[in-house]
């Protein structure tokens, strides 16, 4: 066989081995979690083989959307669209488009993805810093002489689009093109060696993702105390704008976790739910698995209060554990101007949540909850319409 066919056979063998690996003791053992894991490997295969095989040429970049409703990895933000284009230092790229309903973006020049041996944020700049606002058209250059530098070691131009209010409206449009003279030349036909290298890079991405994030979640859970938030941290080599606080929950069916925290000195904050091992969002379209600063009513004392439970307690700020006894509740604060307070927690019976909350706590009945979920699904249909 040729090298490309050998690489294909290797990839298939490694996928089969990864499927068997999901049955090992350090991965979740119950049937539902294992089924989620098999689906997760399918997602990773789609994501990383697609990236390596079809987004391989920095002369012909295009944005690959990741961490949407399908290709999730590494704890995606429910308020984001993620896009990545492969680039090469020394080249120049033009990024154009229109914000439409996108309210902010972070453009990061990255050395690679977090689960790979080489990764990290090299450059970070926001739409606001580029003078771009909701509804605006934009046109800027990445590379020498442009608005965004492209340093040595760069692999991707990565975009995180922010949708704070989840409206039913057109999402952002991004295009990218290489401006170098040789970018106008048609690429050569595929070679066996190039395809083999792309397949091997892609299957490495699949395997690294599944292994890395399972280990990451296990280690983070072991560092903390169940149902308690750890102090907020900045991720080394991550975004300067971001602070994260983790709470790994462990709740009986009739338990409710009441969370309280003063409003942080931040432009944006959000609470979101994740599956263990796979680090995917708990079903963002059909479960109330995220609340941000525009969606969660805040008390008159400037304290955020929310409830995590398996059944709806009737308060507006509810997060749906969706029958998962364990999982990760992440608190994000972005663009901070001071210390981010650590949320406090207490467990109460879900039937007693109303009595445990202050007078004036915002409530939501079944009809209101149904309307809330319908609005979320309609927004997501717009955001991920293609």
Positions of predicted regions on the chain:
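A compositional/structural signature for long, glycine/proline-rich flexible linkers
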Residues: 1-386
